[in-house]
Amino acid sequence: YTFPVYSLSSYSATYNLYSHTNLGSIKLGIVNYELIMANQAYVFNSSAKTNLMWKALYDFTANETSIGLIKDNQLIGNYYKINEKKGESLSENYELSIYPEEKYVSFNNEINWKANSNNIVDALSVYLHISKDVQENPNKKVFSYQIVDKKGINSRDFFIEGFETINIENNEIETIRINAPELRLIFNISKEHNFMPVNIEKTNGKSHFSLVLENFNQQF
C-alpha cells in the first residue's frame, strides 16, 4: 500500500447485518453509516434495524451519533448518544459529553469520569480515529485509545494484524485486518473506501454478529 495524505470526507455506507449461529448465518437487517463534514466539524451517525421477516426472532433498532471538531488535523470528540431497543424495551439509552482539554466525560449529565489523557474516543468515532491513524502511521502495529461507554473510560488496544484479501459480493477487496480483543471486535478497513470498515465482526455474550458492506458513497 502507498497511503495518501490523510483527509476526512463525508460519506455514506450501507451494511448487511448478519447473525451467526450453529445453524448458519441469518441476514437480520441493515445498518447505515453517515459521516457529515462541515466547517471543521463532523457528525457521524449510524442506524440499524432488523428486517420485518425477522422481527419475531430478533427485533432490534439502534441509533448512534458522535459529534466532534477537527483542530490542527486532530479529531476531538465532544458528544456521543446511543438509543437502542430490543423489542419494546430500551437496552441502551444514554449520552456522553466529552471534555478532552479537562480530561473528563459526563455521563447523562449526572456522573463525571476522569480520563488519563485527552485522547478520549467513543464507540462510533473510533473508526474515524483508526482510519486517520493507520494512514499517518502505516508501520505502527498497535493503536491505543481511551474508549468511553456506559461502563466508564477504559484503555483499549487495536492490533494491526496485516493485509487480508476478503470477498464481498464476489468482489475481492484488499484490506487491513484489525483486532480489538478486549472489545471482542475484529474489522477490516479498505484503502478503496477511505480506510473505513468494509467488514465488522462483533461478539456480544454468546451472540456473534457481522456487518458486511453493501454500498459506499464518498462525497468530496
Each predicted region: which residue ranges?
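Hydrophobic, well-structured mid-protein blocks that either form specific transmembrane helices
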Residues: K85-Y127
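Acidic, serine/threonine-rich low-complexity disordered tracts
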Residues: F3-S97, P138-F220
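Alpha-helix C-terminal capping segments
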Residues: K103-F107, D133-V134, I176-A180
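Short, structured interface segments that constitute the first stable element of a domain
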Residues: A41, E110-V148
